[in-house]
């Protein structure tokens, strides 16, 4: 993907340490303050590299696979994409569309407030649009 000044939709990188997919999922839950995530792949698989893409990450599945990462962390991964990636050896953690984008609100509020100090910039509270039971 085209990147401008280091900015763009997805990122790849190394996890803080080698960990199992299960540990990685717990780490994602902690970092994103989420009650749950969906996992495609073997929970005991060791992962060291990750691709992260906010929102719907289906379009980033192939680039993440081609980059050789162990796990794609994204939201809104559909059933077949998740299964296909796991079958190819790349695990997927679906943190949900909301889960991967909610943190952007305050970040963007701060950026806009700094760029346009004459404006009053507020972030709107958001929550998942559905309820897990």
Residue ranges and their predicted role:
Residues 1-133:
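Hydrophobic structural segments
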